[in-house]
């Protein structure tokens, strides 16, 4: 039986934390999120926080986006953003470096929903098949997204029809990721 998106995300998150611990002998550390509340925070120091992913008590669906654009969003999208809190995590997919986007807090979730709504409105204006971004790449004009129609995970050039299929679904994509931990 194939893994669910929720399980694949939990597995990758665990691999990420374990890789960080193996390299740094502590939980992941972040300097950019200092001062931003989150259930992920384990310890706060002057210029950094240590954190770990936290599974939500109850999974959520991002209905605000669906209502705002009048479009049903793919279940993999809801599962990816609605099951845990986490800082963004760096990874490698084949030879491509990515930063897997995550929800740090409920306030961050509101920001994500606004950004996703703007992304979908732009795609509608350009008459593009709707996609739902899940990661950024080294090239600021390329993002990794879920195709809302097929559920395939794709690399897309923002605002264009240039799309390359990376995986048949989000669980498969997450299973192929390798954590990348900065020195």
From Swiss-Prot:
Any GO CC annotation of this UniProt entry = cytoplasmic side of plasma membrane
Q: Keywords in UniProt for this one?
A: Cell inner membrane, Cell membrane, Membrane
Topologically, how does it sit relative to the membrane? Peripheral membrane protein
Q: Which InterPro entries match?
A: Syd (IPR009948), Syd_sf (IPR038228)
Spell out the disulfide connections.
Answer: none
Task: Indicate where this protein resides in the cell.
Answer: Cell inner membrane
Query: Main localization of the protein?
Result: membrane
> Can you tell me which family this protein belongs to?
Belongs to the Syd family.
Entry function: Interacts with the SecY protein in vivo. May bind preferentially to an uncomplexed state of SecY, thus functioning either as a chelating agent for excess SecY in the cell or as a regulatory factor that negatively controls the translocase function.
- Family annotation (HAMAP family): Syd
Q: What name does this protein carry? A: Protein Syd
Give the species.
Answer: Aliivibrio fischeri (strain MJ11) (Vibrio fischeri)
